């Protein structure tokens, strides 16, 4: 078995895809910056270390998620992320 590596936003976001016991996922890191992500599947995003400030689709306010916290994003939408410190995350896809 091999792992697929992904790189986005000029190398500022990197991830490694894997198959968990229940769902496909990625484990990744984000550098300081602001990003807009598009989803293809329903996502469960957990901050492993650091923090992500997120504006979910339809929301008017930004919300910060710290290490150990999870947010969910519907499939086929875009969401915005602000990263103030290098952050590690786990994303599972449903």
UniProtKB/Swiss-Prot annotation:
Top class in the EC scheme: transferase
Keywords of this entry: Glycosyltransferase, Transferase
Source organism, top-level taxon: Bacteria
Gene3D superfamilies for this protein: Jelly Rolls (2.60.120.10)
Gene Ontology cellular-component annotations: cytosol
EC numbers: 2.4.2.1, 2.4.2.2
Catalytic activity: a purine D-ribonucleoside + phosphate = a purine nucleobase + alpha-D-ribose 1-phosphate; adenosine + phosphate = alpha-D-ribose 1-phosphate + adenine; cytidine + phosphate = cytosine + alpha-D-ribose 1-phosphate; guanosine + phosphate = alpha-D-ribose 1-phosphate + guanine
InterPro entries: Ppnp, RmlC-like_jellyroll, RmlC_Cupin_sf
Gene Ontology molecular function: any one: uridine phosphorylase activity
Purpose of the protein: Catalyzes the phosphorolysis of diverse nucleosides, yielding D-ribose 1-phosphate and the respective free bases. Can use uridine, adenosine, guanosine, cytidine, thymidine, inosine and xanthosine as substrates. Also catalyzes the reverse reactions.
Family: Belongs to the nucleoside phosphorylase PpnP family.
Protein known as: Pyrimidine/purine nucleoside phosphorylase
Organism: Psychromonas ingrahamii (strain DSM 17664 / CCUG 51855 / 37)
The organism's taxonomic lineage, starting at the top: Bacteria, Pseudomonadati, Pseudomonadota, Gammaproteobacteria, Alteromonadales
Name of the coding gene: ppnP
């Amino acid at each position: 078995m091999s792992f697929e590596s992904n790189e986005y936003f000029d190398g500022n976001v990197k991830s490694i895809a894997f198959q968990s016991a229940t769902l496909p996922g990625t484990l990744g890191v984000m550098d300081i910056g602001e990003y807009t992500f598009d989803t293809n599947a329903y996502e469960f995003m957990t901050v492993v270390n650091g923090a992500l400030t997120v504006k979910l689709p339809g929301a008017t306010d930004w919300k910060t998620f710290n290490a150990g916290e999870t947010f969910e994003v519907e499939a086929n939408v875009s969401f915005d992320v602000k990263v103030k410190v290098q952050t590690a995350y786990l994303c599972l896809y449903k």
